[in-house]
Amino acid sequence: MKKDFLSILDIGEYELESIVADAVRLKRLKSAGTAHEFLRGKSLGMIFEKASTRTRVSFEVGMSDLGGHALFLNPQDMQLGRGEEIRDTARVLARYVDAVMIRAYSHAAIEEFARYANVPVVNGLSDRLHPCQVLADIMTLSERFGDLHGLKLAWVGDGNNVCNSWLLSSALTGMEIAVASPPRYRPRDEIVDQARAAGGKVTVVTDPDEAVRDADVLYTDIWVSMGDEQERAERLQALKGYTIDSRLLAQASPDALVMHCLPAHRGEEITDEVMEGPQSIVWDQAENRLHAQKALLVRLIAGGMASVD
């Protein structure tokens, strides 16, 4: 039976640990220059409604590393961009490729695609969630801390799709997630409720100092995402005071780490000093998109590394 990855909660705690372990192993194999073509002869279709750097490159390189092939599909070059229904496109593509990754404006569209495709569908980003990013982030923190249970992550700024996925992950990792956002840009209530119902420990406040107190990890993202450009001035005004700078970082645990999923607008959500500082692990998490997604694809397409060793 095919398995999709539309939300971090589509996998359980044990499966998350297994994927992270596989990702670490794949990272070592790549570093050593050892072939690891666990998906030889397999194809991944990639549909991008939104522009991308990290998502496209990491999935394309990942499939190449694994011995497979990634096919880039722009909706404007497909019948999907000319009015073909999602369900029809999903059924046809599933006859050609072994999995589909979609980066779209609408989470509902990805869910509909997954309902009609009989191959695994991966959410490469939607307006609601970004589970691939959080999977890579969890791998990155696991490399630093080992067991994540009891750690506190403070999200500062716009309660966006990455923030939503972090809230949902709390039930799987045992981490406490504290969010500081202005009222208008707080995470969705239904996501907060879902995270708590799943067993997550989450809090949402308006004061950044309160959220970061004793935090082991500080996390932020750009304040103006693709599609929100018309709100730029309003967002910058509302989020003033939510910048991760050296003063805010000092309120966290002494050895707190700083994360940002990129792209960054330095001087807005994060200062250059913090971004380039010794507590920043931004580049590690960016690299780990590659390894975590490779492990995910092996799991979804081939059943995991244990199945293909």
Swiss-Prot record:
GO molecular function: amino acid binding; ornithine carbamoyltransferase activity
Subcellular location per the Swiss-Prot or TrEMBL entry: Cytoplasm
Family annotation (SUPFAM superfamilies): Aspartate/ornithine carbamoyltransferase
Signal sequence bounds: none
Annotated carbamoyl phosphate binding sites: S52, T53, R54, T55, Q79, R103, H130, P131, C132, Q133, C261, L262, R289
Domain of life: Archaea
InterPro entries: Asp/Orn_carbamoyltranf_P-bd, Asp/Orn_carbamoylTrfase, Asp/Orn_carbamoylTrfase_sf, Asp_carbamoyltransf_Asp/Orn-bd, Orn/put_carbamltrans, OTCase_ArgI
Biological process per Gene Ontology, one example term: arginine biosynthetic process via ornithine
Assigned keywords, A-Z: Amino-acid biosynthesis, Arginine biosynthesis, Cytoplasm, Transferase
UniProt pathway: Amino-acid biosynthesis; L-arginine biosynthesis; L-arginine from L-ornithine and carbamoyl phosphate: step 1/3
PROSITE patterns, sorted: CARBAMOYLTRANSFERASE
EC number: 2.1.3.3
Binding residues for L-ornithine: N161, D221, S225, M226
Gene3D superfamilies (UniProt xref): Aspartate/ornithine carbamoyltransferase (3.40.50.1370)
One GO cellular component, as annotated: cytoplasm
Role: Reversibly catalyzes the transfer of the carbamoyl group from carbamoyl phosphate (CP) to the N(epsilon) atom of ornithine (ORN) to produce L-citrulline.
Name of the protein this chain belongs to: Ornithine carbamoyltransferase
